[in-house]
Amino acid sequence: MTGVQITGCFSSRSNETKPESGERPTPASASGKRVLLAYFSRPGENYSYGGRTNLKTGNAEVLARMIGGYIECDVHRIEAADPYSDDYDATVARNVREQDADARPAIANPLASTDGYEVVLLASPIWNVRAPMIMSTFAERYDFRGRTVHPVTTYAMSGLGAAERDYAASCPGATIGEGLAVRGEEVRKADAEVRSWLRRIRLLQD
């Protein structure tokens, strides 16, 4: 795949690379299945315990990096063609407009293909009970029939929110597998929760 932001995994031994056309996706170590971890994350001003905090790295990216540290997978960061503001209130207002319009925000760096992946992990924050609308843009762009899609979310109050329902609608023919929801304020201490979930969905062995 040329011109695609893909990494083998998040780890100290891996740098961001762009596989050449025809390169096969990385096999997962435990299941033998090929796994794509696609995530959207927003740094900047974020909600935290009823207040605000400025994050250099968004919570969903922290969670994606944690997952990528435990399994072999290809990782794709979804970038908005029109980047979201670092300002919390501005992002909230934009998200409300996008939800009300059932918008599909453009992606700056779409993958050329998701062929070859058997398991897809879709990671994002939950905004107003739903994954950001750009996740629907991504999910609807590809044919996930016959694949297993696992929602992965960071949240303030809503857990997985409507992510399972939305991905079921966006990914016809896919199996929506067990999701993982981690409170944003606690994501940096979620190692045990992440490992337990990866074992349950059989991507990590004891």
Each language-model region and where it sits:
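N-terminal export leaders
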Residues: 1-2, 6
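N-terminal beta1-alpha1-beta2 submodule of the flavodoxin-like/Rossmannoid cofactor-binding fold
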Residues: 8-117, 129, 199-205
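Structural beta-sheet core signal
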Residues: 37-39, 75, 122, 151-153, ...
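Solvent-exposed loop/turn segments at secondary-structure junctions
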Residues: 42-45, 80-85, 126-130, 155-160, ...
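Short, surface-exposed alpha-helical segments at coil->helix boundaries
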Residues: 57, 61, 65, 132, ...
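Structured segments of extracytoplasmic/periplasmic soluble domains
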Residues: 63-70, 74, 123, 137-142, ...
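Helix-loop-strand module that forms the ligand-binding subsite of alpha/beta enzymes
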Residues: 88-172
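Glycine-rich phosphate/pyrophosphate-binding loop and the adjoining helix
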Residues: 175-206
